[in-house]
Amino acid sequence: MAAELSMGPELPTSPLAMEYVNDFDLLKFDVKKEPLGRAERPGRPCTRLQPAGSVSSTPLSTPCSSVPSSPSFSPTEQKTHLEDLYWMASNYQQMNPEALNLTPEDAVEALIGSHPVPQPLQSFDSFRGAHHHHHHHHPHPHHAYPGAGVAHDELGPHAHPHHHHHHQASPPPSSAASPAQQLPTSHPGPGPHATASATAAGGNGSVEDRFSDDQLVSMSVRELNRHLRGFTKDEVIRLKQKRRTLKNRGYAQSCRYKRVQQKHHLENEKTQLIQQVEQLKQEVSRLARERDAYKVKCEKLANSGFREAGSTSDSPSSPEFFL
């Protein structure tokens, strides 16, 4: 084990460090394999020895060239903020760079607070929250981004002078960012049951006003049942009773309208028939008068003919001569 540690030129060789490392069983830790391109990326040399009172979330057996050590907490040591930013950006790439599609520069910009946290970084928050929940033995709880508040307060005026007044007027970034960081873990979204109950609660007072009278009458029973899902039984019964009342009222109005229309039609036919009867009566009267006139004329002709036949029976001018 000592031979393996001596092979790494970047590891410390002091007796205190060797004694501190030998206290751990290095065989039980898994070494994460990294691609060759990522291993060639320049990294921060591990020349600083962690004190005995510090707590680290990264095993010491991990190569320093591939995964930098996580920031440690020590009451007697003030670590630099650039190291915290570098650790977070490098640790982000080691976790899952393909899933987040985010560069280390974006993570640094998000820590400084020059623009809102993008959506991929919020998923990183949930991962960090789960990671810190696993390491619950840390003496002080901290946010998803270690050193974010310090970097925002101290590095902000030097890196961005034109945002100095904005940083002074704004509340502390740790307290302002805590609701947004705790949102994915402590405030989960409503489930399907909560959504259905919220829909039913929103329509409790206006279940009868939700559908108009025309919609209730024209809607089929199956479609109405589909729209009434989530409401209470009393509301459904009351709405269906209203639908039946409207249907009965509409049926009665339809029957009344048909009766009125039929009555008007019969009255019109009656008027037309009365007019035709009057016309026929007038025609009968006219024909009766003509008949009487022809009858009188016929009687006159018959009487005059008999008189002439009796007086001049031999006269060739008599009508009977031609007969």
UniProtKB/Swiss-Prot annotation:
Region annotation (Basic motif) ranges: 238-263
Domain bZIP: 238-301
Compartments where located: Nucleus
Superkingdom: Eukaryota
Biased composition range(s): Basic and acidic residues: 34-43
Gene Ontology BP annotations: abducens nerve formation; brain segmentation; cornified envelope assembly; fat cell differentiation; in utero embryonic development; inner ear morphogenesis; integrated stress response signaling; keratinocyte differentiation
Molecular function GO labels: DNA-binding transcription activator activity, RNA polymerase II-specific; DNA-binding transcription factor activity, RNA polymerase II-specific; identical protein binding; protein-containing complex binding; RNA polymerase II cis-regulatory region sequence-specific DNA binding; sequence-specific DNA binding
Free-text tissue specificity from the UniProt record: Ubiquitous.
A Pfam family of this chain: bZIP_Maf
Primary role: Acts as a transcriptional activator or repressor. Plays a pivotal role in regulating lineage-specific hematopoiesis by repressing ETS1-mediated transcription of erythroid-specific genes in myeloid cells. Required for monocytic, macrophage, osteoclast, podocyte and islet beta cell differentiation. Involved in renal tubule survival and F4/80 maturation. Activates the insulin and glucagon promoters. Together with PAX6, transactivates weakly the glucagon gene promoter through the G1 element. SUMO modification controls its transcriptional activity and ability to specify macrophage fate.
Comment text on domains: The leucine-zipper domain is involved in the interaction with LRPICD.
PANTHER family per the UniProt record, alphabetical: TRANSCRIPTION FACTOR MAF, TRANSCRIPTION FACTOR MAFB
Disease: Multicentric carpotarsal osteolysis syndrome: A rare skeletal disorder, usually presenting in early childhood with a clinical picture mimicking juvenile rheumatoid arthritis. Progressive destruction of the carpal and tarsal bone usually occurs and other bones may also be involved. Chronic renal failure is a frequent component of the syndrome. Intellectual disability and minor facial anomalies have been noted in some patients. Duane retraction syndrome 3 with or without deafness: A form of Duane retraction syndrome, a congenital eye movement disorder characterized by a failure of cranial nerve VI (the abducens nerve) to develop normally, resulting in restriction or absence of abduction, adduction or both, narrowing of the palpebral fissure, and retraction of the globe on attempted adduction. Undiagnosed in children, it can lead to amblyopia, a permanent uncorrectable loss of vision. Some DURS3 patients manifest sensorineural hearing loss.
Subunit-level organization: Homodimer or heterodimer with other bHLH-Zip transcription factors. Binds DNA as a homodimer or a heterodimer. Forms homodimers and heterodimers with FOS, FOSB and FOSL2, but not with JUN proteins (JUN, JUNB and JUND). Interacts with PAX6; the interaction is direct. Interacts with ETS1 and LRP1. Interacts with the intracellular cytoplasmic domain of LRP1 (LRPICD); the interaction results in a moderate reduction of MAFB transcriptional potential.
Protein name according to UniProt: Transcription factor MafB
